[in-house]
Every structure is written in C-alpha cells, then in structure tokens.
C-alpha cells in the first residue's frame, strides 16, 4: 500500500506542478539557464493554493504525515494541517517581507516535485542548525541517484521584488566578500569551509530523520559517504571526490518582471554564472553541475506573500 508521503508526491505533481511550473524555457546550447512560465490570469490564487497545500509536506515530518486522512478530500485535509502547523511551535511567525520560508517552500517544490529528488533535511532538523549557528544554512539540501551514483543537490533561493535584487542576493550567497584591505569579511555559501561544515558536519548526521523516505540504494550511497568522512577522516568534499559523487548547485529566484523569455535577461543569468565559475575553483570539487532557475511574476512579491497567508488569519 502506498504511504501518505508517496500519495502526496503524486498529488502535487498532478494538481500543482502546472500552476507555477507549466512551461520550462531554455536557451539553445546552454544547459545552465532555465525559466518557468505559466497561466498568469490566476497567478495570485495559484501561488496561494500551492503554498497553503504544500506547506504541510514541507514543514511536517514523515512520522506525522502518515496519520493524515487522505481517503476523501485531500485538499481539505492539507488545508486543515496547514493551519495547524502555521500556529505550531514548528513555525516562527515573522515579517512576511523578510521571512525566508516563502522562497524555501517553492525551491523545495522545484527540487522534490518538479525534479523528483528526495530531501536530506526536514524543516525541523534544519532549524536545529539555525538555532545554534550564525550561518543559517543552505536553503535546500536534497539527493538523488544519477546513473547509479549519488548526486547531492544544494539550492539557494530568493523571493524578492526585482530581477536586479534577485541577481545581487544570489551572487552574495555565492561569493566570499573582502574589505578594502583584502581581509575576508563574509564567507559565501560556495566555500569549502561552509560546505564541509554544513553538509559533512551537520546534514549527513541528520539522515535518521529522513532515511525512511530514501530509496535503499540512495541510503547506501549516503552510508558510503559517511564512512569516508567519519571512519577515514575525509572532509565532505574530499569524500565526494573520492567516490566521484556529484553536487548539483541550483540558484532559484522568484521576482516581478515583464520579461517572460530567458533571452531577454541573459546578462543576469551570465553574471551569476560568472560569479559561480570564479568561486567554484576554491572548492576543489571534481564533479558538479549548475542550474539557474527563474520564475518571473506579474504581481509583486509582497502582494503574492500577503495572498498566501490570508487563510492563516
């Protein structure tokens, strides 16, 4: 019998994917650049529906999800659970214009539902890292098997007002920053110390919380990785290189824009690619890939966020 987890994954793919990820646009001979467009006539309602109904899948844990009543009206059950979780200790209510959960939920949808990967960190386990570290962690961490080998997907997301802001904030996540004297003032997330600490030192130790939803072969590959790190005293990046596993980096942004074709904003994509190519050298990583994914909206980010939280009162 299918688990509630599997039932919901299929439900979102059938009922929600087309709302915001209807058509993927590319640029010929460039595998890095992606844009999703959709039917803009119901944009606010579609963002609201996706956020409200996906919220339990993103926030709740696997053990709680198995008790959801999905036999009759799945939408009603998800809205009920969404409202309960919104007011629970799981969720800290903050200023909607600053709270990262909006973008984080949609990049999770992209990674798990559209791209069909599996999460490596639950919302609750990720918060444990946030509670004790100045660096708040990578926005989304997932994994899959690619030609039989482990691929770890590390994603950063911005849900902001403009394309320029999205580009600038994504580059800020990528690059180390220095003062006028050449002293390091902020480590970007594409930094070996940051990645070794967050993924190797924290995330891989949390796999008990998500292991029930991983395919056995995927779980075995993660065990190989942990063996290299724990028993053989390799860093995460050294272990990835030794096993020839891949990291896929996804930089995702949602912003208001009249441009609905990636060719019209190619320079913004290219600036992020240039930043990534400059910083990736520091990692010493042998096997990696890059996706830059944009969703342009008609409505402002603030209006979309206000619409999404209407049901919570």
Describe these PLM feature segments:
Residues 2-84:
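A structured, charge-rich N-terminal accessory region that forms the first stable segment of a protein
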Residues 12-26, 262-313:
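Charge-rich, low-complexity intrinsically disordered segments
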Residues 84-108, 127-130:
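A short, highly charged nucleic-acid-interacting micro-segment common to nuclease
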Residues 111, 140-142, 151-159:
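Conserved catalytic cores of phosphodiester-cleaving nucleases, focusing on short active-site segments
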Residues 114-133:
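A short acidic/basic microdomain associated with nuclease active sites
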Residues 119, 145-151:
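Short, solvent-exposed loop/turn segments that connect beta-strands within catalytic domains
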Residues 161-172, 262-269:
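Active-site-adjacent loop/helix micro-motif of nuclease/hydrolase catalytic cores
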Residues 168-251:
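Acidic, metal/cofactor-coordinating or nucleic-acid-engaging core segments within structured domains
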């Amino acid at each position: 019998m299918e688990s509630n987890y599997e039932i919901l994954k299929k439900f979102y793919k059938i009922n929600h994917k087309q709302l915001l990820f209807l058509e993927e646009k590319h640029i010929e001979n460039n595998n890095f650049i992606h844009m999703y467009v959709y039917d803009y006539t119901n944009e606010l309602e579609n963002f609201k529906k996706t956020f409200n109904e996906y919220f339990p899948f993103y926030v709740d844990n696997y053990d709680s999800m198995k008790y959801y009543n999905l036999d009759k009206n799945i939408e009603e059950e998800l809205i009920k659970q969404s409202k309960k979780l919104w007011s629970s200790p799981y969720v800290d209510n903050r200023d909607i214009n600053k709270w990262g959960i909006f973008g984080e939920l949609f990049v999770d949808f992209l990674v798990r539902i559209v791209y069909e990967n599996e999460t490596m960190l639950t919302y609750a386990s990720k918060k444990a890292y946030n509670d004790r570290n100045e660096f708040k962690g990578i926005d989304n961490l997932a994994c899959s098997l690619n030609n039989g080998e482990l691929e770890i997907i590390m994603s950063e997301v911005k849900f902001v007002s403009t394309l320029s802001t999205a580009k600038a904030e994504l580059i800020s996540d990528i690059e180390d920053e220095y003062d006028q004297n050449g002293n390091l003032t902020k480590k970007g997330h594409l930094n070996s110390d940051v990645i070794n600490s967050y993924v190797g030192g924290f995330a891989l130790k949390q796999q008990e919380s998500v292991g029930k939803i991983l395919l056995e072969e995927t779980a075995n590959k993660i065990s190989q990785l942990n063996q290299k790190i724990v028993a053989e005293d390799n860093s995460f990046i050294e272990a990835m290189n030794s096993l020839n596993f891949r990291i896929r980096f996804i930089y995702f942004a949602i912003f208001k824009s009249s441009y609905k074709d990636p060719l019209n904003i190619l320079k913004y994509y290219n600036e992020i690619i240039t930043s990534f190519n400059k910083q990736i050298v520091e990692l010493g990583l042998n096997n990696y890939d890059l996706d830059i994914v944009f969703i342009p909206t008609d409505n402002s980010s603030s209006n979309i966020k206000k619409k999404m939280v209407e049901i919570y009162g």
